[in-house]
């Protein structure tokens, strides 16, 4: 899945150019940096590659979400609707701006169920945040229609779906704003990093300042900049941006390999009629970082996962239902409001509600789901061997369940 699997001299060259100048910060020091502006170059490359008018780099996908939420005017007491299956950072980002995360059931796209979203809208709802999990995408048209109907912002968390598209447009560029993560296990990586993309100039200007202590970047030097609003330090470094600049040039190479390997593994597992696959709203746009598949029952799925573990073939096959970081069932620290800084009353009330919320619709899907991460390093023979081992286990346990 991740770009770190295929390091090359291109990444080393970009990093060395930064080290040769000695200027690791993205802003200022115009003379000593000798014309090297890696963060600016990467932002331009993101806009060109994904078709966004503006891009603002940040230190992580989480800080990108936080920055985007603030730029969209989300704040204390506002409600943000997001899926119950997501990396915990999506939830944390909403809390970090004083807003209230509202989790809803997913469907077999593994992200927001539009019907569940409609039912969750209240007078306090400010934003809908689809999370394009595991390389694919939400039903963006349905969610955009809901946002338009209720005058809500659409913020795409595309941190896990770099390179995916929906009806010809890259995910992360369709809503009012979208975010990418470039951490170590994303399709392209900076080591750590993120980006906000938007086609709205005002949103971009706010992101640009908010991610750098409120600097308006209009002064002759940093000391002459004004600070029209509060901001924080969510800057990316030139070193991290340099790695990303090399990686984005190689994205098509990575996606081609991912899709080939994904297709080969899917063809093997498709031989088992009891297996069904994740619903992809636009199959041509799947970035293919994961192959997500379902078994008939939770009992059979758990038995398969346990046997994978026993046979040492579980690595890379994720059973999110028991995962501490990606599914709300394991988020007791959040549900209990275990924060080192006190949460506001509205947030505490929302967390209290979450503790008893019925998300059985999501449970029914996630308890039967396994996601197989797609490596860029696999050979055809390795995929064949892996797939056949997986298929053997699954068939054996399906048969055992049938004869009981």
Predicted feature locations:
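Short amphipathic alpha-helices in soluble, non-transmembrane regions
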Residues: 207, 302-311, 387-390
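Conserved PLP-binding active-site segment in aminotransferase class I/II-type PLP enzymes
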Residues: 1-62, 66-70, 148, 366-367, ...
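PLP-dependent aminotransferase-like
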Residues: 70-158, 165
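Conserved PLP-binding active-site segment of the aspartate aminotransferase-like
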Residues: 279-281, 288-298, 315, 319-337, ...
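Conserved PLP cofactor-binding pocket of PLP-dependent enzymes
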Residues: 214-222, 264-269, 305-369, 401-404
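Active-site region of PLP-dependent enzymes
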Residues: 29, 34, 161-167, 174-290
């Amino acid at each position: 899945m991740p770009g770190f699997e295929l390091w090359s001299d291109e990444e080393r060259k970009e990093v060395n150019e930064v080290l040769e100048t000695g200027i690791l910060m993205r802003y200022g020091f115009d003379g000593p940096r000798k014309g090297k502006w890696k963060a600016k170059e990467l932002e331009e490359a993101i806009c060109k590659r994904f078709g966004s008018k503006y891009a603002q780099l940040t230190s992580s996908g989480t800080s990108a979400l936080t920055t985007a939420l603030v730029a969209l005017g989300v704040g204390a007491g506002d409600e943000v609707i997001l899926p119950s299956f997501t990396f915990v950072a999506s939830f944390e980002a909403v809390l970090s701006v004083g807003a209230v995360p509202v989790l809803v059931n997913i469907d077999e796209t593994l992200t927001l169920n539009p019907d569940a979203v409609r039912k969750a809208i209240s007078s306090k709802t400010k934003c809908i945040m689809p999370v394009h999990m595991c390389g694919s995408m939400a039903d963006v048209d349905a969610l955009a229609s809901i946002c338009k109907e209720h005058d809500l912002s659409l913020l795409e968390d595309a941190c896990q779906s770099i390179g995916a598209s929906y009806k010809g447009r890259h995910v992360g560029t369709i809503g009012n704003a979208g975010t990418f993560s470039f951490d170590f296990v994303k399709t392209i990586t900076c080591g750590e990093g993120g980006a906000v993309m938007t086609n709205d100039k005002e949103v971009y200007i706010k992101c640009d300042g908010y991610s750098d202590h409120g600097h308006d970047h209009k002064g002759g030097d940093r000391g002459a900049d004004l600070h029209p609003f509060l901001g924080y330090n969510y800057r990316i470094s030139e070193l991290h941006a340099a790695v990303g600049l090399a990686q984005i040039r190689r994205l098509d190479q990575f996606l081609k390999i991912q899709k080939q390997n994904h297709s080969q593994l899917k063809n093997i597992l498709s031989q088992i009629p009891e297996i069904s696959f994740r619903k992809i709203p636009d199959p041509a746009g799947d970035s293919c970082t994961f192959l997500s598949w379902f078994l008939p029952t939770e009992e059979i799925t758990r038995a398969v996962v346990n046997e994978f573990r026993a046979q040492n073939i579980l690595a890379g096959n994720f059973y999110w239902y028991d995962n501490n970081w990606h599914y709300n069932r394991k988020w007791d620290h959040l549900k209990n409001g275990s924060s080192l800084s006190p949460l506001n009353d509205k947030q505490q009330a929302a967390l209290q509600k979450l503790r008893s919320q019925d998300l059985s619709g999501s449970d029914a899907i996630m308890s039967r789901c396994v996601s197989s991460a797609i490596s860029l390093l696999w050979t055809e023979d390795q995929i064949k061997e892996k797939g056949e081992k997986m298929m053997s286990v699954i068939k054996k346990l399906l048969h055992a369940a049938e004869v009981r």
